Regions:
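Alpha-helical transmembrane segments
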Residues: 3-33, 67-69, 73, 78-83, ...
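Membrane-interfacial loop-to-helix junctions in multi-pass inner-membrane proteins
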Residues: 17-25, 44-59
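Alpha-helical transmembrane segments within multi-pass membrane transporters and channels
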Residues: 31-41, 45
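Alpha-helical architecture
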Residues: 36-37, 54, 58, 120, ...
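Active-site His/Glu-centered metal-binding helix of metallohydrolases
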Residues: 37, 41, 62, 124
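Membrane interface segments of multi-pass transport proteins and intramembrane proteases
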Residues: 42-52, 86-95
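Alpha-helical transmembrane segments and their helix-start/interface "positive-inside/aromatic belt" motifs
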Residues: 51-63, 125-131
Length: 186
């Protein structure tokens, strides 16, 4: 249900010609399908453990590989693959992940690691949506700053054209997450 609200809101408000928007939507659907498959195994098949960790990791790896492939294939500038420390001049520290083809490996680890981090926090209180809302709120700012040249220059972020549209995607995650929390209070 959650991915539907995010998708509809994103499709209504985001620039649909932006590659990041479509890749983000694909990512949320791929990982949402993995979660659905796990819940299906738990509820319908009455298997309390759901999918095995190995199977989940395999599905996550396939989804991450597809996302990384799309990001790498549509790379438009050197800043798309630049690793930086925020608020530090790129001249002082920056590393182009295209060197030795590290970008696909790094992006894969970030995507799968982030997915599993959310799953690990879910076991703590049953509502993984709270950290998702908080992180998405921060990502609204980072994606906007990175995507707008005026702000990226002043705050020492590399400018990535089109990244500002991801702030809309992240805002839809925050909105859907807050709606989910409100729904669960009753």
């Amino acid at each position: 249900v959650y991915k539907r609200q995010i998708s509809v809101s994103t499709l209504l408000w985001a620039d649909l010609e932006n590659r990041f928007v479509w890749i983000a939507l694909l990512g949320i659907w791929l990982f949402g399908l993995i979660g659905w498959r796990d819940d299906y195994a738990k509820v319908i098949k009455e298997n309390s453990t759901g999918m095995s960790a190995k199977r989940k990791f395999q599905y996550q790896s396939i989804a991450a590989f597809i996302i990384v492939l799309l990001l790498y294939a549509t790379n438009q500038s050197a800043n798309d693959t630049l690793l930086i420390i925020p608020f530090i001049k790129p001249e002082i520290f920056s590393f182009d992940l295209r060197t030795w083809h590290l970008y696909p490996i790094f992006a894969y680890l970030v995507i799968v690691g982030t997915s599993n981090a959310v799953n690990l926090t879910d076991g703590l209180d049953g509502l993984a949506i709270v950290p998702v809302v908080m992180i998405s709120g921060a990502l609204i700012i980072f994606s906007y700053v990175t995507g707008i040249e005026f702000w990226s220059e002043r705050l020492l972020f590399p400018h990535v054209g089109g990244a500002a549209e991801l702030s809309i995607f992240c805002a839809t995650i925050v909105g859907a997450g807050l709606g989910f929390l409100w729904f669960n209070t009753h």
